Amino acid sequence: MKSLALNYVLQTARVCISGSRPPLHLLVMNNSIQTIPFTNLILAFIPAIVVVVIVWRWGIGYKRSIYALARMLIQLLLIGYFLVFIFKSDSSLIVIGVLAVMLFTASWIALHTKKIPRRELYLKSFCSILLGGGIILLLITQGVLNLSPWYLPSYVIPLAGIIFANAMNSVSLAVERLEAETERSVPYEQARIIALRASLIPITNTLLAVGIVSLPGMMTGQILSGVSPFIAARYQIMVMCMIFGSAGISAACFLAMVRSNFTTKEENI
């Protein structure tokens, strides 16, 4: 069973590097790879249940934790079935539609500020994530991986999710810190620098800790699937670079676009 998983992953890696069109069995899920039975998956909920009990005993509000766990379970099961449909469809239009939904949603979620209505900043949030995330996604899928077809769902959608999510978080941190600094009457140019630095703190810490404190999710998943750690490390390097790039570019673009929203006319002049 392990050899089947290794063969599947290595075949996928080879066709991506060579640029040739993968066979149909690589475009869809490989049913030969061992799955986790639901009865075994229940064991993974034991630590979560322990936390819920602790929260309940401490009177913090256990209902929210239960709701979060239930929602997580439903969302992941639904997205699993949805992705199976997308992978089997092999349609560029469906992939583009999914990317559009991800982009529009990320642009809206990124804006948590309460002082300025989201609608005033939404277009700028959208453009910044599109520029920062879209360019990185294009570079990775067509430059690094050289996917064929270019819309290969099993690669494009997961990579887009990673890129857009990190760009979204970076923009969210940037706007929150920018708002806090401008409320303290800090000049915009200085506030922008502080906001950009704050938006890059999480990913910078991750870069410093990767490989020493923790093994990232993608690398861990590949190693568990039987992939050589050297191959997994290359993929993880690619992922870390695209995360850092999308986060920094998106935040910088957003901070450059929203100057008029956080300054007076006199300051702009």
Predicted regions and their residues:
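Pore-lining and gate-forming transmembrane alpha-helices of multi-pass membrane transport proteins
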Residues: I157-G161, I231-A252
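Juxtamembrane helix-boundary/capping and inter-helix hinge elements in multi-pass membrane proteins
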Residues: W58-G59, A180-E189, L224-F230
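Hydrophobic alpha-helical transmembrane segments of membrane transport and translocation systems
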Residues: M242-I269
